[in-house]
């Protein structure tokens, strides 16, 4: 495992991080949401993102094999099982999140349709041409070698298979001074970009099925998470440490400021392997 992967795993496996993402960020869904005017409900907005991505897969029949990389608590996988009857495998680095994922599956009677695997998406523990679809939400940014992730996705996808994912990214030519506090918080030298991921796609010979730029939602989401965290601070006393809350608020402020300064981007990308 790379040093960055080790740092990421330790962070998400910490008690504070687990409790924060479970209680504040969105429960089963811990990714950026789609907000409507006047709406600040994180869980509802996060589920809208899942629904928006899932509609792009309506042409795939029940029984389709889907791999979710960086799956978090597995909320997207359970949605796809229930609504699309897909056979889902969730791969994730955090063992704590994976345990919660398995518990959710047990409670909802989905264990036989939803396999949860401890693993790193830079080295997927699956044979070539195993999956019809690969799905990911706001996870690829954590890789120190994003092209390796794309190569692994290409390897495990069947011919004609599709990769659909969202990711927080940086704008081409982004102001380093504004971007740097965001990168330091997540221990990265850079983020991906629409251009970078399109270059990866071209290098692998994939078809572009559509890219949706939803950048304003990034600011909406981080602002909503910050407001929710501030509003529930007393409630979280004894659940999440004060030091973690203070650190998280500072980090969320950096994301909001960078988003407003137009150095960040977020969207949904959808590609097909030939």
Residue ranges of model-derived segments:
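A short glycine-rich, Lys/Arg-flanked "PGG" loop and its adjoining helix->strand segment in the class I
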Residues: 147-162
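Short, glycine-/aromatic-enriched active-site segment of Class I SAM-dependent methyltransferases
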Residues: 165-189
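N-terminal auxiliary segments of SAM/dcSAM-dependent transferases
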Residues: 1-21
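A short acidic, Gly/Pro-enriched loop at the edge of an enzyme's catalytic core
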Residues: 122-133
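Conserved Class I S-adenosyl-L-methionine
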Residues: 210-274
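Class I SAM-dependent methyltransferase SAM/SAH-binding core
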Residues: 65-68, 73-123
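Conserved alpha-helix/loop element of class I SAM-dependent methyltransferases that forms part
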Residues: 27-36, 40-62
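Short alpha-helix
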Residues: 189-205
